[in-house]
Amino acid sequence: MKISILGGGGTRTPLLLKGLLSLEEELELEELSFMDMDEQRLLLVKRVLDEIAKEGKGKLRLTYTQDIRESIREASFVICAIRVGGERLRIIDERVPLRFGVFGQETTGPGGFSMAVRTIPRVWEITNLLAEVNPKAWFINFTNPSGVVTQAILGYSSLKKVVGICDAPSSIHKVIAQFLNKKEEEVFTDYFGLNHFGWIKGVYVDGEDVLPSILELIKDLPDFERITRFPGEFSALIKMLPNPYLYYYYFKEEATKDLLRAERTRGEIVEEMNAKLFHSLREGSNPLSIYLDYIKEREASFMPGRLKGIALAEGEGYIDVALKVIKGLAKGDAEVAIVNTRNLTAISGLEEDDVVEVPTLFRKDFLRPLSAGKIPAESLAMLKQLKEYERLLIEGVATSSYSTLLHALTLNPWVPSYHIAKKILDAFIEEEQEYFPHPG
């Protein structure tokens, strides 16, 4: 089997390789092709990858290329993890909304909007090429904003063998299992929503829903609010555990004030860490040690505190989901993972072709989202608004329509008014004009 990794110079790529090595014999892996347009970055990450590869059986070939056709040809799976515009434009995504008192974040809100406008056309180019060169391959999308990008692929390309992956739900599952002192496979999290916009409405152990007990425990647990920023009583109020990104929706004012007080955005922190990593890889003699130090620093910067006894490594959620998906689709053993896929009938009240984030069953070359059952009316109303925003955003990109993009941004839950939406959009056009249509 051959697997292609687009964006192979990314900082999570070594973690992905480590995970794939654990399935080297089971999947009969023969080649991993790492493709990246940034040759220098790819060659520096190659130093780390070559060291990690020594842990394998020695039969797996690692190849490196800037030729996307070469990389995707004959691959069974194509993993897409690109960042159009790099960290520089991520920072602009975060900073522009703040000028107008609106929270900026790279995957949701106006920041995610801008990232989607830049990213979707490039992903369409890739998927159109894949449909021409290797239409039988499965396309696994890591590229953010994952849900919107996956929706754009399934709605506007001929590819149907597409899965979108985000680490948030699987990371929540891991934390819950550790909190309950259970193995991950002993716990089922009844999750529903969209990417970075979902809830856990049940946690099942031995057939019993233990979520009510969890909500009661965390209500008076100081560490819970310190780590998640959600007051324990809030989860008890909605009777669900919210995805951490829902903090930006339920607590917009607090989230915006926190970021306005901060000296640097998340993108600026990551940019500095990445620059330090690549400088050290260029100058240092022990690439694997340098990389592991980087991962520890990034992990600590993202989650400075933890619940006692609970640990989660940087990137661990992404890799575990990817391995489950690949193993299930390739081998046929039943696997269940929370991914972004077509709704079908999983969430009643949304359209069949809406991309949702739900537990999904994987078998050989087959997937089927599991039914979410009855969900709260308030959640469905929020999902419908965000889904309409996503549809208009993708339509605006497809038609290069300023007015449609403005309509979409006006519907974004983070944006308080039409006038603010217009100011933000016009500012993005000024800062990132090569990616945006102009008015008129």
Language model feature labels by segment:
Residues R61-E74:
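Short acidic low-complexity segments
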Residues I126-G207:
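Internal, well-ordered domain-core segments that constitute the primary functional module
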Residues R88-Y156:
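Rossmann-fold NAD(P)-binding glycine/threonine-rich loop
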Residues K54-T63, E185:
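A short helix-to-beta-strand connector/capping loop
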Residues S76, R83, N144:
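Short glycine-/small-residue-rich Rossmann-like dinucleotide-binding loops
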Residues I3-E28, L32:
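N-terminal Rossmann-like dinucleotide-binding module
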Residues L27-D50:
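NAD(P)-binding Rossmann-fold cofactor-contacting core
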Residues N181-G440:
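Long, compositionally biased stretches enriched for glycine and/or charged residues
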